[in-house]
From Swiss-Prot:
Subunit structure: Heterotetramer of two alpha chains and two delta chains in adult hemoglobin A2 (HbA2). HbA2 represents less than 3.5% of adult hemoglobin.
The name this protein goes by in its record: Hemoglobin subunit delta
Residues found modified as Phosphoserine: 51
A GO biological-process term: carbon dioxide transport
Any Gene Ontology CC annotation: cytosol
GO molecular function, one term: hemoglobin alpha binding
Length: 147
């Protein structure tokens, strides 16, 4: 559960309505893979990840980034039940994919950076604080099934 004020919730959802999920998702996942290269081991089937340009131009990275942000959108619609919303994804990433749950926090922080880059002055410090709460809540929900 994420505790947002009514004003924060309105602001987060208003900004999210302007997000180009295709572009932002690909950029966020791509940046994660470039900035934290050890995360690439989970994406070996994606082909060429040999350089920042290869990662950022990789169509599989872009497609998966879009998928990730689609799930994030679902989370925004269910802020009062993030653990339930992400239960199956948590189980998948824990039991089958064996993803380090710290990677969820890293991706959330990268997403905040990408939103700031894309929205400039509209992404105020207050907006950042609200989004940090959301990405922390999503990361916590995704890590829920880990033992």
């Amino acid at each position: 559960m994420v505790h947002l004020t009514p004003e924060e919730k309105t602001a987060v959802n208003a900004l999210w309505g302007k997000v180009n999920v295709d572009a932002v998702g690909g950029e966020a996942l791509g940046r994660l893979l470039v900035v934290y290269p050890w995360t690439q081991r989970f994406f070996e089937s994606f082909g060429d990840l040999s350089s920042p340009d290869a990662v950022m131009g990789n169509p599989k990275v872009k497609a998966h980034g879009k998928k990730v942000l689609g799930a994030f959108s679902d989370g925004l619609a269910h802020l009062d039940n993030l653990k339930g919303t992400f239960s199956q994804l948590s189980e998948l990433h824990c039991d089958k994919l064996h993803v380090d749950p710290e990677n969820f926090r890293l991706l959330g922080n990268v997403l905040v950076c990408v939103l700031a880059r894309n929205f400039g002055k509209e992404f105020t410090p207050q907006m950042q604080a609200a989004y940090q709460k959301v990405v922390a809540g999503v990361a916590n929900a995704l890590a829920h099934k880990y033992h």
